[in-house]
Amino acid sequence: MLQSNEYFSGKVKSIGFTSSSTGRASVGVMAEGEYTFGTAEPEEMTVVSGALKVLLPGTVEWKVYAAGEVFNVPGHSEFHLQVAEPTSYLCRYL
């Protein structure tokens, strides 16, 4: 079953799903902007196209992740994103 989600007044949209190869996950697109997300459980984020500038919990420096790159976010935390162009991603819930 697919579950559609919309955040930040429609600037971030995702579709949640479960599959044997990825487990529970969502795939989505972020429009240009700055966003803060909270996590309930650990997440693995893969940038599919575009790039995300990320400030992870416990860090003080922003890091850019380009298409094909992966970063992990601890559970029960929040992370900040800056998006300069429409960017797609895959989020796996670990």
Swiss-Prot record:
Q: Which reaction does it catalyse?
A: a purine D-ribonucleoside + phosphate = a purine nucleobase + alpha-D-ribose 1-phosphate; adenosine + phosphate = alpha-D-ribose 1-phosphate + adenine; cytidine + phosphate = cytosine + alpha-D-ribose 1-phosphate; guanosine + phosphate = alpha-D-ribose 1-phosphate + guanine
One Gene Ontology term of the molecular function aspect: purine-nucleoside phosphorylase activity
- Alphabetical keyword list: Glycosyltransferase, Transferase
Q: Which Pfam families match?
A: Ppnp
**InterPro entries with a match to the protein in the record:** Ppnp, RmlC-like_jellyroll, RmlC_Cupin_sf
The enzyme's main class, written as a single word, is transferase
Q: Which cysteines are joined by disulfide bonds?
A: none
Q: Which Gene3D superfamilies match?
A: Jelly Rolls
GO cellular component term of the entry, any: cytosol
CDD domains from the UniProt entry = cupin_PpnP-like (cd20296)
Q: What is its EC number?
A: 2.4.2.1, 2.4.2.2
Name the family the entry cites.
Belongs to the nucleoside phosphorylase PpnP family.
Q: What is the documented function of this protein?
A: Catalyzes the phosphorolysis of diverse nucleosides, yielding D-ribose 1-phosphate and the respective free bases. Can use uridine, adenosine, guanosine, cytidine, thymidine, inosine and xanthosine as substrates. Also catalyzes the reverse reactions.
**HAMAP family (UniProt xref):** Nucleos_phosphorylase_PpnP
Q: What is this protein called?
A: Pyrimidine/purine nucleoside phosphorylase
Gene encoding the protein = ppnP
